[in-house]
Amino acid sequence: NLQDHTIRFIVDDCIKFVKREQRRGRKYDGIVMDPPSYGRGPNGELWKLEEELFPLIQECMKILSDDALFFIVNCYTTGFSCSTLNEALSRSIQKEKGGHIECGENLLPVTTNDSVLPCGIFGRWTND
């Protein structure tokens, strides 16, 4: 039932975007993020998911509306576990807003046999 809702897809430096939205006083009912494992900004800024994800989630919480419905994180970082993502979401969003957290593996089915290939993890907070 999202046909009557405004949905924006943003490709931008995530921290700069979130801080800009904070200054503008904007609020969102849901956030879907797919942060990179590693990256460098134009001025040599270093981004490492394992160091920056928790602060990013905390900043995003400031732009979640009081009636937020969901917050989804997709990760492809090798060695970043479901339990780590679950802990980050629990200590931030769930601690402040309650709700439910689900974390798991992203799996790709292999069409030539009856198996799957793991290709990352996801975390989802919902306000239920």
Question: What are these language model-derived features?
Answer:
Residues 1-32:
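S-adenosyl-L-methionine
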Residues 48-51, 89-90:
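Glycine-rich, phosphate-binding/catalytic loops in enzymes
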Residues 13-15, 37, 77:
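Active-site-proximal loop/turn and secondary-structure-junction residues that shape catalytic pockets
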Residues 50-66:
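A short glycine-rich, Lys/Arg-flanked "PGG" loop and its adjoining helix->strand segment in the class I
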Residues 68-128:
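C-terminal catalytic and target-recognition region of SAM-dependent MTase-like enzymes
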Residues 28-42:
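Conserved proline-anchored active-site loop of SAM-dependent methyltransferases
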Residues 41-49:
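Glycine/threonine-rich flexible loop motifs
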Residues 19, 40, 80:
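Conserved protein kinase catalytic core
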